[in-house]
A protein has these predicted regions:
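Ser/Thr-rich, low-complexity intrinsically disordered terminal regions
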Residues: 1-105
Length: 105
């Protein structure tokens, strides 16, 4: 399990509206968006080197903007060998690019 958290100087609704860009960047499948709770989830598919990951994303208000939290969990296995962190960082970078801003932290 890997968790990546980044703050942005934009309102939560701006990040929420560009979450599909993050899903597309990681090749996410079957996305589910729960707007009232600020929660989204998707999964990555299996490949030659991976069984795939479950990705849970929350967007929450924070001082001066909003916070994006991305948590990845292996579908099967014990170690992800850094795959979860790479996926979470790719997701966050795509969201930042689509929102036209950079992460504060």
């Amino acid at each position: 399990m890997t968790t990546v958290q980044q703050r942005f100087a934009v309102p939560p609704d701006v990040l929420w509206n560009v979450l599909p860009a993050g899903v597309a960047a990681i090749g996410g499948q079957q996305p589910v968006y729960d707007g009232p709770r600020g929660f989204a989830t998707c999964r990555t598919g299996m490949s030659l080197l991976s069984w795939g990951q479950h990705i849970n994303v929350t967007v929450s208000p924070s001082e001066g903007g909003s916070t994006l939290t991305i948590m990845t969990v292996l579908k099967l296995g014990v170690w992800d060998w850094g795959e979860g962190k790479r996926i979470a960082n790719r997701f966050a970078a795509a969201v930042a690019y689509a929102a036209g801003t950079a992460a504060l932290t």
